[in-house]
Regions:
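C-terminal cap/substrate-recognition subdomain and adjoining C-terminal extension
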Residues: 70-211
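Alpha-helical substrate-recognition element adjacent to the catalytic core
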Residues: 1-121, 125, 199
Length: 211
């Protein structure tokens, strides 16, 4: 069977929530953060600037917030089945996220996902500082990681799959052999070769095997 690589976004794709919005709720600024998130995902705001603005609002949160936030996360219907199905075929699965390793790593472990790229939040003396600890994961970063993982796995780009919902997923969706907009924002839907409008990630397998 042909070796393949599936790369997905996390927030609103692999899971039903936007982790940064959940963190915003913990900080008492949930609505403000959610409004910025929605505009950023629609491509109406510069993603880097929008992320920095939202992270600033999280300053002062205790690092215990990561575990609490993870307990509120639910996987999208079909997500775990898609990962298991891919692994049963010998395929690899990775996630690329503008979210945060502090929660993403727990999600990845629970879903048995092979690779993960995400942002790191700066924590000093057990508290979030409101800053990021490393370079921001951008739409360009997501694309580059897809390309790097494909090379590392020995998978031809024609046999890669990219799935996402936001404007920052468009470059990887367009570069992959099979690019899927999943319950996506209008700008992403228009840019994607394939779309799924039902919250069932196993529908992606039908597209992959048909393509």
């Amino acid at each position: 069977m042909t070796a393949r690589l599936i790369v997905m976004d996390i927030d609103s794709t692999l899971i039903n929530q936007e982790v940064i919005d959940l963190l915003g709720e913990e900080a008492g600024v949930g609505e403000q953060v959610a409004r910025i998130t929605e505009r950023a995902m629609r491509g109406e705001l510069d993603f880097k600037q929008a992320l920095e603005e939202r992270v600033e609002l999280l300053a002062g949160l205790d690092k215990s917030v990561f575990e609490r936030t993870f307990t509120r996360v639910t996987f999208t219907p079909g997500a775990l089945e898609l990962v298991r199905s891919a692994h049963s075929k010998g395929w690899k699965v990775g996630v690329v996220s503008g979210g945060f390793h502090e929660v993403a790593d727990k999600i990845v472990a629970a879903a048995d996902i092979d690779f993960c790229l995400a942002n790191h939040l700066e924590v000093v003396d057990g508290k979030l500082t409101g800053k990021l600890a490393a370079d921001i994961v951008t739409k360009e970063s997501k694309l580059i990681q897809l390309l790097d993982w494909a090379v590392g796995c020995g998978v031809d780009m024609a046999h890669t799959v990219a799935i996402g919902d936001g404007a920052n997923d468009i470059p990887m969706i367009q570069a992959a052999g099979t690019g899927i907009a999943f319950c996506a924002k209008p700008k992403t839907r228009e840019a994607a070769p394939f779309t799924i409008d039902e919250r069932n990630l196993m529908l992606a397998m039908d597209i992959i095997l048909r393509d």
